[in-house]
Swiss-Prot record:
The keyword Signal does not apply. When hydroxylated at Pro-137, ubiquitinated via 'Lys-48'-linkage, leading to proteasomal degradation. In endothelial cells, ORMDL3 proteasomal degradation is controlled by the sphingosine 1-phosphate receptor signaling pathway. InterPro entries: ORMDL. This is ORM1-like protein 3.
Length: 153
């Protein structure tokens, strides 16, 4: 252990999803959210699954595709200032294990939600729109692209 030394990463945002235990913690947080929503009285199971999916995808969209920059003062001369967390992750390399995990997780949650809502039309449409809103920005073709200038600065 090196006491008193700084981390070796220029931008710690690039490797945060590769930290030990982060994937398990992420899945457990989704499970905890679901259990908390299940504990609300008079809310049906299909509504809870849809709420779990919508809250997860909203949080994922905000934290990965809307928030830009880094909370650290980095010596990269402002390169990370204009990039979302998704674009910074793994130094922008596509198809890494972390990116695959964060792409597959909402898909698995979508399948579970669709199953437990018994493919109800309203739930299905809400969950599909929510899934597309987090999957489309993850496409490699949209790396660094700001559609209609949204989130440009």
């Amino acid at each position: 252990m090196n006491v008193g030394t700084a981390h070796s990463e220029v931008n710690p945002n690039t490797r945060v999803m590769n930290s030990r235990g982060i994937w398990l913690s992420y899945v457990l947080a989704i499970g905890l959210l679901h259990v908390v929503l299940l504990s609300i009285p008079f809310v049906s199971v299909p509504v809870v699954w849809t709420l779990t999916n919508l809250i997860h995808n909203l949080g994922m969209y905000i934290f990965l595709h809307t928030v830009k920059g880094t909370p650290f003062e980095t010596p990269d001369q402002g390169k990370a200032r204009l990039l979302t967390h998704w674009e910074q992750m793994d130094y922008g390399v596509q198809f890494t294990a972390s990116r695959k995990f964060l792409t597959i997780t909402p898909i698995v949650l979508y399948f579970l939600t669709s199953f437990y809502t018994k493919y109800d039309q309203v739930h299905f449409i809400l969950n599909t729109v929510s899934l597309m809103s987090v999957l489309i920005p993850k496409l490699p073709q949209l790396h660094g692209v700001r559609i209609f200038g949204i989130n440009k600065y």
